[in-house]
Amino acid sequence: MTSHPVFIDLSLDEQVQELRKYFKKLGAEISSEKSNKGVEDDLHKIIGVCDVCFKDGEPSQIDGILNSIVSIMITIPLDRGENIVLAYCEKMTKAPNQPLAKVCLQSLWRLFNNLDTASPLRYHVYYHLVQVAKQCDQVLEVFTGVDQLKSQFANCPPSSEQMQKLYRLLHDVTKDTNLELSSKVMIELLGTYTADNACVAREDAMKCIVTALADPNTFLLDPLLSLKPVRFLEGDLIHDLLSIFVSDKLPSYVQFYEDHKEFVNSQGLNHEQNMKKMRLLTFMQLAESSPEMTFDTLTKELQITEDEVEPFVIEVLKTKLVRARLDQANRKVHISSTMHRTFGAPQWEQLRDLLQAWKENLSSVREGLTNVSAAQLDLARNQKLVH
């Protein structure tokens, strides 16, 4: 989202006077005279009634009024501005409809970008900004990823508690529209806990697992098991379910669902989507150890009909998690490569062996090229001697 600098031609006193008159004319309970306590008291009074303009004003007119209020706010010293900024942010969350919510969002974004980057108030503005963005379906305009979020607060990082609160909000506003992003947010949230306080993150850990399982684009689930709050769930059904998605095959999930159907449904997980994901994960696991698989093997392992094999493999190839070739004539699937479901010691050893083999091959090639080069030089010298 773009934001323009705030510039108002009138003096502060003149702006305050005009704003007071404007809101009084709209019927707000406010005096048209300036406060003798100073501009901060004026702002408190103005912000207290500023939402009256939401009733009948045009969005463009309201944007101008809010812009004027912001231009005054950013002149207030940091040590005296917190209550003013918080009061304004709270008012901006009260927009009665989507068009006005967009105006409020723009105003908060303007305030956010005009505050000093080292100001701790930016966190509070951003938190409310996300709330308003949800109201007008503009979340991705203000939040595109965790890295972008951290860069916003590089000069004044919020506390762990503040970030946990913000991550929970971001998860809530993205879970219905972008499960992949929501899952990344929850993983980041769990990463803010330490061994000392991980035990209190039970609810967050469960949300993180459910979000990751529900995301149709998240397949590498092994890293979740290493998160401290997730470890505290060992022995719980949700941890057992996660373990199945990490390393077990489809029959294990089917059995779990038969035994704990109510639990799976209570978590908001869709059984058919779970089956689809487990089939893909099972296929990946089979591909790790089998360079080729028959259609008969796939129908048995994936619990699908033979007619469903080809469409299934095509869907797998679209994910780019597996590289393979269909052999319809021989009713086989030939595997070129696959992403591993887990990446532990065996996978590191396999990678080490592969790199060692590459190193040896490169050494052989270099030695061969050296010999060819030496032979060419000898041949050239001999030809010179002959002539």
UniProtKB/Swiss-Prot annotation:
Classification via Pfam families: eIF3m_C_helix, PCI
PROSITE patterns according to UniProt: PCI (PS50250)
Main localization, broad class: cytoplasm
Molecular function per GO: caspase binding; cysteine-type endopeptidase activator activity; translation initiation factor activity
InterPro entries: ARM-type_fold (IPR016024), COPS7/eIF3m (IPR045237), eIF3m (IPR027528), eIF3m_C_helix (IPR040750), PCI_dom (IPR000717), WH_DNA-bd_sf (IPR036390)
Example GO biological process: formation of cytoplasmic translation initiation complex
Subcellular location: Cytoplasm; Golgi apparatus
A GO cellular component entry from the record: eukaryotic 48S preinitiation complex
Swiss-Prot/TrEMBL keywords: Cytoplasm, Golgi apparatus, Initiation factor, Protein biosynthesis
Function of the protein: Component of the eukaryotic translation initiation factor 3 (eIF-3) complex, which is involved in protein synthesis of a specialized repertoire of mRNAs and, together with other initiation factors, stimulates binding of mRNA and methionyl-tRNAi to the 40S ribosome. The eIF-3 complex specifically targets and initiates translation of a subset of mRNAs involved in cell proliferation.
Subunit organization: Component of the eukaryotic translation initiation factor 3 (eIF-3) complex. The eIF-3 complex interacts with pix.
Membership in a protein family: Belongs to the eIF-3 subunit M family.
Name used for this protein in its record: Eukaryotic translation initiation factor 3 subunit M
Protein species of origin: Drosophila ananassae
Gene this protein is translated from: Tango7
